[in-house]
Amino acid sequence: MHGQKDYDLNAGKNLVFSGQNGAIVLKDSVTQGAGYLEFKDSYTVSAESGKTWTGAGIITDKGTNVTWKVNGVAGDNLHKLGEGTLTINGTGVNPGGLKTGDGTVVLNQQADTAGNVQAFSSVNLASGRPTVVLGDARQVNPDNISWGYRGGKLDLNGNAVTFTRLQAADYGAVITNNAQQKSRLLLDLKAQDTNVSVPIGSISPFGGTGTPGNLYSMILNGQTRFYILKSASYGNTLWGNSLNDPAQWEFVGTDKNKAVQTVKDRILAGRAKQPVIFHGQLTGNMDVTIPQLPGGRKVILDGSVKLPEGTLSEDSGTLIFQGHPVIHASVSGSAPVSLNQKDWENRQFIMKTLSLKDADFHLSRNASLNSDIKSDNSHITLGSDRVFVDKNDGTGNYVILEEGTSVPDTVNDRSQYEGNITLDHNSTLDIGSRFTGGIEAYDSAVSITSPDVLLTAPGAFAGSSLTVHDGGHLTALNGLFSDGHIQAGKNSKITLSGT
């Protein structure tokens, strides 16, 4: 085999296999350099114990299924191209990674005698064409799965999988389940970037400017003292001594390591509270659960959800379904999206049930929701003006979220809801957009400002209030039953029919 020669990767040659149902056994480890392997028919590739392969990648032509029983090496990625299927079926822990841009990769690595198994240390999907199928939940650490430009499909294949972080560049990132057995996806999104750099600036004795929250130092009486800046500028430290002003400085000791750790801990605590946004899609036969997250972390979905037989559950946090701002070319360093732009893409959210407990849910602009909602001590806003934009959207860089408000100018940009809502235990429902469906409220409150609310099922309000505000219009096709207060504001309208 023509492989890498010394340090010359280009010495590696491409190899094309065209025989039918062939078998290849590696007697030694192979470093093929820039050479790739192309399979025009189905093959099985294995290796003697401990032998590995590295090279430019593997191409599986359309209609082929290559069974790959060879592990890689740490720090190297197996590149998969071609419309065919690559089934990973080695043994033990494969320390190498996977980058796939086409076709299907089935992860079916087998455990070694100690029970250890890992198909890849990391998986990256890009181009929108690849699919990765999980043989079981142990094949790869979900937190090491990422989606690049246009992404690809991760098929959970009936497994229960937990993510503590989602790394998705755009709408092409898809998490799905095509198996008959329902998958359970837990989005315990508490992970954060722990790589924190803490530079130490010098304090000018004559005053100056700096970055609030950053660490600074000054030598006083032969001793280095460390301070955290509290304001954008600070005064003279020679007279008037601004170091003693708690509005300008916070003294954090004389131990450099402890001072650095104090700043680092605060940065990490701040990151834990930062919202999480997923630009991709959740589809197929699965239930999705978002548990209570640290710091009251908000979760924003501006991709889409299509779980016609599934339940999405939110516990003790803020959940926002919204459309997606159209990405624009950057001009003179401007962000690709902004809160005040007028053009947004519509997004659909379809599920059997949206379950809310102690939660705050917003259906915002350019989002349509088709689902029943079960609410326990939660607040629901349909037609919310609350939105988030990712200032690095479409760049592939680290997410930078900006929160604000955005009110649609046209009817087509307004949110829409269709389904039946059950409110329990002091839940509240604010309807400010088009609503079609039913409402059952128990010890809860409903407030309507939308001129387009249609109850197609009998409305039931037990121990609950109903308020139709100025300009609101409620039409109940099958009657309205209430033992509580019903209030109608000026220029509001309640239309009843049926019994």
What are these regions (language model features)?
Residues M1-N14, D102-T104, T113-L125:
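Acidic Gly/Asp/Thr-rich repetitive segments characteristic of extracellular carbohydrate-active
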Residues G84, K99-Q110, G128-P130, R297, ...:
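Glycine- and acidic-residue-biased ligand/ion/polar-headgroup-sensing regions
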Residues Q4-K5, N10-G90, L134-S197, T254-V305, ...:
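Extracellular, surface-exposed repeat architectures
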Residues N77-H79, G96-K99, S122-V123, G310-L312, ...:
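His/acidic/aromatic-lined binding-pocket segments of jelly-roll/cupin-type domains
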Residues L9, T100, T209-P212, E314:
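Short, well-ordered loop/turn sites that connect or cap secondary structure elements
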Residues V196-R266:
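Tryptophan-rich substrate-binding surfaces of secreted polymer-degrading and adhesive proteins
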Residues T113-G115, S233-N241, I327-H328, V389, ...:
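Short loop/beta submotifs within extracellular cysteine-rich repeat domains
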Residues A111-A119, A126, T311-S313, T318-I320, ...:
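Beta-strand-dominated lipid-handling architectures at cellular/organellar boundaries
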